[in-house]
Amino acid sequence: MGVDIRHNKDRKVHRKEPKSQDIYLRLLVKLYRFLARRSNAPFNRVVLRRLFMSRTNRPPIAVSRLIRKMKLPGRENKIAVVVGTVTDDVRIQDIPKLKICALRVTDGARRRILKAGGQVMTFDQLALASPKGQGTVLLSGPRKAREVYRHFGKAPGTPHSHTKPYVRSKGRKFERARGRRASCGYKN
C-alpha cells in the first residue's frame, strides 16, 4: 500500500494584486491594469507585475548604478524606469542629466538629480508621457544584495562553503575550534 503524496505545499504563488493596502499604489495598479489591457505593449504588463511584488522583490537602486546603466550605448535621452526606490550614492561626485521615473526617490537623490538639470517623474506622469513605454529603459536593483542571502547556500562549515553562519558573536570562542583547525578534530 503506497503513501499518498501530500498536496499541501504544491500551489504556485501568482499575485493578482498587491498585498499592500497603500491607496496610491492601488491607484497606480488601477491605471496600469487599464494600460496593460488596452495596449498590447509588454512594458505595461511588466510594470503591472512589478507593482504587485513584495518589497524584497523591489530592491532599491543607487544613483551610481542608474548612471552606469544609462551610459550604455543607445540609452541616451531615454527615461530610466524603476519600480522601486532610487537612493543617493555619496561616492559619485558629479551626476549627469538624468530623466527618471520611480515609485520613490530619496531626498538626497532627488536633490542631486534636479540640480544636475534632470527630471524626476511619477508613474502617472509616465503613463501620459509614454503610454506604451516608448523611449524608456526598465531597471531594477540587485535582489541578492540583501544581507540575508549571505546565510543561504551550502551549510557553513562544510568544505568550499562560503555561507555565513548565524552566530551570536565573532569572538575567539565562537565557531573557531572543531572543523577550523587541525589540532581540534579536523580542518575543512
Swiss-Prot record:
Keywords, in A-Z order: Cytoplasm, Endoplasmic reticulum, Ribonucleoprotein, Ribosomal protein
GO cellular component terms, semicolon-separated: cytosolic large ribosomal subunit; rough endoplasmic reticulum
Principal location listed in the UniProt entry: cytoplasm
SUPFAM superfamilies: Ribosomal proteins L15p and L18e
Entry GO MF terms: RNA binding; structural constituent of ribosome
Location(s), subcellular: Cytoplasm, Cytosol; Cytoplasm; Rough endoplasmic reticulum
Record GO biological process: cytoplasmic translation; erythrocyte maturation
Similarity comment text for this entry: Belongs to the eukaryotic ribosomal protein eL18 family.
PANTHER family for this protein: 60S RIBOSOMAL PROTEIN L18 (PTHR10934), LARGE RIBOSOMAL SUBUNIT PROTEIN EL18 (PTHR10934:SF2)
Subunit structure of this chain's protein: Component of the large ribosomal subunit.
Protein name: Large ribosomal subunit protein eL18
Gene this protein is translated from: rpl18
